[in-house]
Amino acid sequence: MSPYISPLFSITMIMSVMLISSSGHWVFMWLGLELGTLAFIPILVWWHSSLEVEATVKYFIVQAMAAAVFFLGGMVSLSGDFMGGVNQLMGNIGDMMIMLAVVTKLGLAPFHYWVVDVVQGLNYIPGAVLLTWQKVPGLAVLTQLATCNNSSMLLLFGMVSALVGGLGGLGQTQMRKLLAFSSISHLGWLVVGCVAGSLLGLSYFTLYVVLSIPLFSILHMLNGGHLNQLRTGLMFNPLMSVLLGVGFLSLGGLPPFFGFFGKWLLLTHFVGQLLLGVSVVLITGTLISLFYYLRVSYLCIVVLGPQQIMSGLNWRKMQLSGLMSGLLVLNMLGLFLVGGASCLPK
C-alpha cells in the first residue's frame, strides 16, 4: 500500500468516530460505523497474504450483515412513529435490533466467534488496530444506547463476555487466539464501564490500549505465533522476556501492576452502587483469564531453555523504542495509582 494512501484511511477512521460522537441519530451512527469499516478493510490486507485475505472476507461478511440488521432496526424504530398505539413496541424492537447489530460488530459474547478467526489470520499490527481502535465506534454507539432502557441487557452482554473471554483462552497455544479471547474479556469490562458512565469506560479503554500496544509490538518483532515459537524467540532476549511477562501480568489485572488500576476503578463504582452480582461475575472472569496470562508470563520470565543453561552464547539484543519502554515500565505503577486515587476527596 502506498504510504500516501494509508494516512487517508487513518483520517477516515478518526472522522467516523467524530461523526458518531457528534450525532444522536441512528442514521449518522450507521454511516459512521460503515465509514470506519470501509476505511479499515484495506489495512487488513496490508501484507497481501492468503490468510489475511480470508480473514478480511470473514470480517467484511460479518460487518455487512450487522450493518443490514442495524439499518433494518432503525427503519423499524422509525416506522413506529407512524403506527399509533404500537409506537412503543416498535421502538423497543428497533432499539433491540440496533443493539444486537452493534454487539455483533464489536464481537461481544455470544457473537464473538468471528473475532477469534479473523485475528488468527491477521498480522499483529492490523490485529492490534482491530482489537483497540476499531472498538471505539461501536462503544460510542453503545454509550448512547446505554442511556435508554437497554442498560440491563448491555450489562448482561458485558458479564457474559468477561466469562467467555476467560474460559475461551484456557486451552489456547496460539498467541493471536489468546489475545483475541483476552480482548473479548476486556471488552466485557469496557461495555460495563460504558454503562456505568462514559468517563469510566473511556478510562478503562485508555488503560487497555496503553497495555496492549507494547505487547502487540513486541510480538510483531518476535514474529511468534505459537507459545513454543515465542519461547524460542525470547530465549536470547532476557530483557524482552521480562518486559513481555510483566506486560501480560498487567493486562490480566494482577496487582501491583498498572492494569489492576482500571479494574479497581470499575469495581469501586459497582460496589458503591451495590451491584455486587456484576462485580462477582467480572472478578470471576478475570480470575479465570489470569490462568493463561500467568502461563505466558511464566514462560517469558521463569522458564529457561536447556540451550540457555548449557551454552555460553551471548544474548542477542533487540532495540525497544523509548515510548514502548516507558509504557512497559508504567505497568509497575498500579498500586501507586490506586493509593493516590484513594486519597482524593470524594
Swiss-Prot record:
Q: Which reaction does it catalyse?
A: a ubiquinone + NADH + 5 H(+)(in) = a ubiquinol + NAD(+) + 4 H(+)(out)
Q: Which Pfam families match?
A: Proton_antipo_M
Q: Annotated Gene Ontology MF terms?
A: NADH dehydrogenase (ubiquinone) activity
User: Which key words tag this protein in UniProt?
Assistant: Electron transport, Membrane, Mitochondrion, Mitochondrion inner membrane, NAD, Respiratory chain, Translocase, Transmembrane, Transmembrane helix, Transport, Ubiquinone
Documented EC number(s): 7.1.1.2
Q: Where are the transmembrane segments?
A: 1-21, 26-46, 60-80, 96-116, 122-142, 151-171, 178-198, 199-219, 242-262, 274-294, 320-340
Q: Which family does it belong to?
A: Belongs to the complex I subunit 2 family.
The protein, known as: NADH-ubiquinone oxidoreductase chain 2
Q: Which organism is it from?
A: Branchiostoma floridae (Florida lancelet)
Query: Which gene name belongs to this protein?
Result: ND2
